[in-house]
Amino acid sequence: MIQLVLAALIAQEPPAAEVARLKVAHARVTQLGQTSGDSIWPGFRPDTIPVLYVLPGQGVLLLGWSGPAPEGFAPVAGGSWQPSTERGAASTGTELAGRPVAQVVVGAQTLPELVGLTVHEAFHVFRRLAKRENSFLVSSYPVFDAKNEAGMALEGRILAAAERARDRAAQRALAREFLAVRESRHRTLGGDLAAFEQLAELNEGLAEYALLRAGEITKEHPTFGDRLAGLDGLTADRTRSIRLRYYATGPAQAHLLDLLAGRSWKARLVAENLTLQDLLAEVSEYRRAEHDLRRQAEGAFAMRAIEAAADSGVGKLRAFRRSQVDSVLGAPGLLLVMTLEGRSLGMCGLDPQNLLQVDQGVLLHTRWVQLCAGDALQTTFNTPVVQDRNAGSVRAVVGADSGVRLTVAGQATELRDGSRLENATAVRLESPLFTLQAAKADISREGRVLTVRVKP
């Protein structure tokens, strides 16, 4: 029994040699962040981001955490330790005690590789609010399309050649070749999957760029040059996840932007919500002929006057739409105001010929619409409806007071001015102009305004 207890206690102790190695790796990341973080990416400070180093089957070492250690962690020199037999963790950006942290799974990495991986995951934390690719599209990506595979393989070889090129003219020419091949392939691939690739390059690709840029600064491997073989053979191992390809094409485009435009492109990419492909097209003058022709047309046809007329027309349209809403809601009869708590309101049926935009997020259904939310709500309107997606409300004049009927749990209920019903169940409202069925709702009446708050 004593031996078992001692074995359990020993198992809970952090492995001293590995902890020492991880502390060295983290110290290098800290120094890199303090001296060169902006050289990797504007505002990036990996030294300010806590790191969870996961030792599978042993425990988790937390370094760079400020303040008291989170619950379950015991102090060790320079950090905190939590024993664990968990083996299923992945390197990622995550949260601990409500704070963003980088998580690094420790295996057989060299010290420089650990530094790079820490920078990669810290960059994910730094960019955690950026738009991500729709990972579900992996399930429908055309992995058996040989033409798409060949196109992607060609893109990899062009990017590798651009990395090897030693003068800017050759780099710019190869960038244009890459874009021509990429855009041709993307036209066949379709908009959703093309966007998936470009967003994956911004997500995983830029994190990998940060890793390789760190290697370039510290003169440690891996560096951009170490990835040339991977670009040359981008599609060689077709058994691997396609997402891994963007770990190669993303940093390759980013480094090519470094070579062609210095480091100023990074701030623009964020400020203007661009993709790597967008910026590469600009700095390589890929669309120069298009831009020249557009400027020629704008001059020949007085574009400034056209823009002024468009601005005036849009302003008049916006004012007219608002007057339409005022007219619709000012019609005689009971005004229904409906909201839905805790979930989104869907359109189960609409008449596209009679659907008008009033403003950003505000719609006017001029004739007919069915709005729904699963079992919680079903409606049909045969009268104009104003749907405000920003406020989550629906407004419609639903007929004369005398023609609107309310039943609650199968019982007819009168709609008197000033009345209020809370948590009413099996609600049904109807008139010749609409029907509304809600599983649960609060209902109130003030003057001509009937408010229905549909509850989850």
Where are the language model's segments positioned?
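Post-HExxH zinc-binding segment in Zn-dependent metallohydrolases
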Residues: 56-60, 129-189, 193-228, 235
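Non-catalytic terminal regions of proteins
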Residues: 23, 27-34, 247, 267-456
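N-terminal mature-domain "stem" immediately C-terminal to a signal peptide or N-terminal signal-anchor/transmembrane
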Residues: 12-77, 108, 207, 364-366, ...
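Catalytic zinc-binding patch centered on the HExxH motif and its immediate surroundings
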Residues: 70, 75-98
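Catalytic glutamate of the conserved HExxH
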Residues: 117, 121-129, 207
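Active-site-proximal alpha-helical
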Residues: 191-221, 229-295
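Short pre-active-site segment immediately N-terminal to the catalytic Zn-binding motif
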Residues: 103-118
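Sec-dependent signal peptide recognition
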Residues: 1-7
